A protein has these predicted regions:
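A compositional/biophysical signature of low hydrophobicity enriched in polar/charged and small residues
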Residues: 1-178
């Protein structure tokens, strides 16, 4: 395969990924039409991307303004205290387990970041009380590794995962107070 073919394949992979991120429920024919290739080529590329771990799953994008759950962000600033062996073995980053036992939250993302904070945890909870319970338990279980915690509630999600979440009228009303 020459450089032109590799670049063309890479471009097609990007187009397919973009279409899947917009709407992963599109059928292969529709994706193929939008990307300028056959459904069979789309299927082959999707299978390849799945095998390479580029596509790790398919998920529904839920509009938080239409559910009973609220979105929260927990900012975590670490101390310089290195993790001990027990912490390394039990930290729930690489496997599907809870950060703390028995809390009524659903973890969305755990992100290691560069900046004023070291970690960002995003999650949903029924209300601020459940979010604060999670916040308090995180501090209780990991306190020797935490310099600062900050809990933020998402008041109005304008856009998430590329989709507009708030109704136009609500956005207009909200921007008046900004």
């Amino acid at each position: 395969m020459n450089k032109h073919d590799i670049a063309q394949n890479s471009n097609l992979e990007e187009k397919i990924l973009n279409e899947l991120q917009k709407n992963c429920r599109l059928n292969l024919d529709e994706i193929g039409k939008k990307c300028g290739c056959s459904r069979y080529k789309v299927a082959r590329i999707m299978k390849k991307l799945e095998e390479e771990g580029i596509i790790v799953g398919y998920s529904a994008v839920v509009n938080p303004t239409k559910t009973k759950f609220k979105y929260f962000i927990l900012l975590v600033k670490r101390t310089s205290q290195p993790f001990d062996e027990e912490m390394i073995n039990n930290i729930p980053i690489m496997r599907e387990t809870d950060f703390v036992p028995v809390v009524n939250i659903k973890s969305i993302a755990t992100l290691y970041v560069h900046g004023n904070y070291d970690w960002i945890l995003t999650f949903t909870a029924p209300d601020i009380a459940d979010a604060k319970e999670f916040y308090n338990k995180i501090f209780k279980y990991y306190n020797k590794y935490i310099e600062n915690l900050e809990l933020l509630e998402i008041v109005l999600p304008f856009r998430m995962h590329g989709f507009v979440m708030a109704p136009d009228e609500e956005i207009k009303n909200f921007t008046k107070i900004l």
